[in-house]
């Protein structure tokens, strides 16, 4: 839950940003308390994002093997570990493929029902599509009424608790109810941030310890482990450069394919649009172990195992959907009247795209590239199966060290990666926000 919570938050945020806050204010003017307006108005509107976040977490956790392998025991074996055991130890590719197909079938079945009820467009920050139109609501029937009854009940409970709190706790007359709500929101947000960030920052002090193994609290202060990372015999600098090179090329190819696809999906109406969108974002909803095993089969026939080209193509497959989703979210907020004005002044579509559209949304494009870069840089499953032992990326080297020899060198590498990735994320978020402000 700790590792996957950010993915859930980002998925819900994309939908919640499109909710009109005036609706809750209107409910307040009609006498509804904040609890009632949340459960009866805000939560139903944010349900596509909540469901999308839950499903993405479910699918991603199905493909998890790093955390169970490092922290779990024999009784905590996950299905991905079973697939890897059949391939690496038993060389039973047929049985591993059968398990992978069962896993893929389960995931596709779940997302089929999700698409029927809410629509896959919510994954790109859209609202409920045609899948949740009046026709679907009529099919839901009793289920919708039952759900509304639950939400109404939760709203009444929250309203009653709020009224009881007002009677028991005396408020400062100079402070409004919104001030207290804002304070509570900051407290909850602070707890979540501490939950997410605190375990990560435990790595930093450990990387400066004088001991030869991981201990807490760390003893002494030493830079020897950072010296080990940058020593001439260390594999980490070369692995870092290799990971950066692969991530750059993967991000480039993902942008080359993903940006035109995003424009087509947002601006064009054609038959089978939802099917094509589902196909393009399918790597997001498919556990990476299935993609890695499938690409291993394919690339082995094409003699691409153990080559940089094979690894770059594999990373492009998993990064392209994130580029499409990110660029689609930016294009949806773009004012097409700017393009139309350029057309009326005699500019062609290609010139308009190059001199008008791209400069305005370039922040979003750079952010999409950086997201693709981060995902590729941090990818382990593809590196395990597509490198063929010929070379190793930085995540693969860290994985081997975590399994074979855990020492403070790993903490030093993790600290450097934390600084590197944090810088990229902050820059990409800054560019995304600036792009949204320019579009708005």
Where are these regions (language model features)?
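Membrane-interfacial helix termini and adjacent extracytoplasmic/periplasmic loops
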Residues: 1, 35, 71-74, 166-177, ...
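Transmembrane alpha-helix signature in integral membrane proteins
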Residues: 1, 208, 234-265
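N-terminal signal-anchor/first transmembrane alpha helix
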Residues: 108, 172-202, 276
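Transmembrane alpha-helices
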Residues: 2-20, 34-63, 188, 193-200, ...
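Interhelical loop and adjacent transmembrane-helix boundary motif
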Residues: 68-120, 177-181, 223-235, 377, ...
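C-terminal transmembrane helix and the adjacent membrane-cytosol boundary/short C-terminal tail
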Residues: 10-24, 28, 39, 95-172, ...
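Transmembrane-helix boundary motif in ABC transporter permease subunits
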Residues: 12, 21-24, 38, 42, ...
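Non-cytoplasmic
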Residues: 8, 49-84, 203-212, 323, ...
């Amino acid at each position: 839950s700790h590792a996957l919570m950010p993915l859930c938050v980002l998925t819900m945020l994309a939908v919640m940003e499109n909710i009109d806050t005036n609706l809750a204010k209107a409910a307040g003017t009609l006498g509804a308390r904040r609890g009632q307006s949340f459960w009866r108005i805000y939560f139903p509107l944010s349900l596509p994002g909540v469901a999308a976040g839950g499903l993405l977490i479910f699918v991603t956790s199905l493909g998890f093997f790093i955390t169970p392998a490092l922290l779990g025991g024999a009784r905590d074996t996950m299905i991905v570990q079973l697939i890897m055991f059949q391939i690496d130890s038993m060389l039973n590719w047929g049985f591993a493929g059968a398990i992978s197909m069962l896993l893929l079938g389960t995931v596709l079945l779940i997302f089929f029902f999700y698409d029927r009820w809410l629509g896959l467009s919510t994954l790109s920050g859209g609202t409920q599509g045609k899948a949740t139109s009046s026709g679907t609501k009529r099919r839901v029937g009793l289920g919708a009424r039952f759900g509304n009854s639950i939400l109404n009940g939760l709203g009444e409970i929250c309203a009653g608790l709020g009224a009881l709190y007002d009677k028991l706790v005396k408020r400062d007359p100079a402070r409004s109810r919104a001030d207290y709500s804002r304070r509570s929101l900051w407290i909850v947000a602070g707890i979540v941030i501490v939950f997410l960030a605190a375990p990560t920052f435990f790595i930093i002090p450990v990387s400066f310890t004088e001991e030869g193994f991981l201990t807490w609290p760390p003893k002494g202060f030493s830079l020897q482990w950072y010296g080990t990372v940058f020593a001439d015999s260390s594999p980490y600098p070369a692995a870092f450069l290799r990971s950066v090179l692969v991530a750059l090329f993967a991000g480039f190819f993902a942008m080359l394919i993903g940006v035109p696809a995003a424009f087509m999906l947002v601006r064009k109406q054609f038959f089978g649009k939802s099917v094509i969108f589902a196909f393009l974002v399918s790597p997001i909803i498919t556990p990476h172990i299935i993609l890695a095993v499938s690409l291993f089969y394919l690339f082995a026939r094409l003699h691409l195992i153990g080559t940089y080209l094979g690894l770059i193509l594999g990373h492009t497959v998993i990064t392209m959907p994130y580029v499409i989703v990110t660029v689609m979210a930016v294009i949806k907020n773009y004012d097409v009247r700017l393009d139309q004005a350029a057309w009326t002044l005699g500019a062609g579509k290609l010139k308009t795209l190059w001199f008008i559209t791209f400069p305005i949304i370039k922040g979003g494009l750079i952010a999409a590239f950086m997201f693709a870069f981060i995902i590729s840089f941090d990818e382990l499953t593809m590196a395990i199966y597509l490198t063929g032992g010929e070379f190793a990326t930085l995540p693969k080297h860290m994985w081997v060290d975590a399994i074979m020899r855990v020492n403070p060198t790993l903490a030093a590498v993790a600290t450097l990666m934390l600084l590197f990735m944090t810088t990229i994320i902050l820059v990409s978020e800054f560019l995304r926000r600036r792009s949204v402000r320019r579009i708005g």
